[in-house]
Amino acid sequence: MNLIPTVIETTNRGERAYDIYSRLLKDRIIMLGSAIDDNVANSIVSQLLFLQAQDSEKDIYLYINSPGGSVTAGFAIYDTIQHIKPDVQTICIGMAASMGSFLLAAGAKGKRFALPNAEVMIHQPLGGAQGQATEIEIAANHILKTREKLNKILAERTGQSIEKIQKDTDRDNFLTADEAKEYGLIDNVMQPEDK
């Protein structure tokens, strides 16, 4: 069951009810709190474009608590973050795994954060293939190219060498918030005194 809280806002013109995500959007906050698929990506991309159209100078805040998901859907979000004019601050709450960690690293340099108990997990892309040998070979080549592209971007975003990224993403690699900072996936760990 998916419950979405409603908030009531009172102004001099009366009361208005919002779902919590629409209310947060008014403050330029986007929440990525699920696995990443095409529907989630379309929603995030639409919100990013909307906020850019509203004000192309003000930062956008993308909160991430995601196990990851579709690589192509994730690239749609990543490319939009890189394309739009406003800086996107990324904040990991809970877990940013797989494509979630990739999007965490996609934030504006100096504006990528994690809460103290957040976890980040990086690994190579997952895929599967079935069918004739030729189709399996095509799928295998595609996932290898995708891995190469992801590793190249992660190396650019973190300052790590491609060789280190390849080694560190060969299997699931879990990092604490402090380790993610040391690795270059984020810039700072938010502390309670940062409120």
Swiss-Prot record:
Keyword Nucleotide-binding: no
Location(s), subcellular: Cytoplasm
Matching Gene3D superfamilies: 2-enoyl-CoA Hydratase, Chain A, domain 1
Source domain of life: Bacteria
Record-listed E.C. numbers: 3.4.21.92
GO cellular component, one term: endopeptidase Clp complex
Catalyzed reaction equations: Hydrolysis of proteins to small peptides in the presence of ATP and magnesium. alpha-casein is the usual test substrate. In the absence of ATP, only oligopeptides shorter than five residues are hydrolyzed (such as succinyl-Leu-Tyr-|-NHMec, and Leu-Tyr-Leu-|-Tyr-Trp, in which cleavage of the -Tyr-|-Leu- and -Tyr-|-Trp bonds also occurs)
Swiss-Prot/TrEMBL keywords: Cytoplasm, Hydrolase, Protease, Serine protease
Active site, UniProt feature: S98 (nucleophile), H123
Claim: Lipoprotein is one of the keywords in the record: no
Predominant subcellular localization, coarse grouping: cytoplasm
Enzyme class, spelled out: hydrolase
GO molecular function: ATP-dependent peptidase activity; ATPase binding; serine-type endopeptidase activity
An individual GO BP term: protein quality control for misfolded or incompletely synthesized proteins
Family under the similarity heading: Belongs to the peptidase S14 family.
HAMAP family reported in the protein's UniProt record: ClpP (MF_00444)
Subunit structure as annotated in this protein's UniProt entry: Fourteen ClpP subunits assemble into 2 heptameric rings which stack back to back to give a disk-like structure with a central cavity, resembling the structure of eukaryotic proteasomes.
Purpose of the protein: Cleaves peptides in various proteins in a process that requires ATP hydrolysis. Has a chymotrypsin-like activity. Plays a major role in the degradation of misfolded proteins.
Protein name according to UniProt: ATP-dependent Clp protease proteolytic subunit
Protein's organism: Staphylococcus haemolyticus (strain JCSC1435)
Gene: clpP
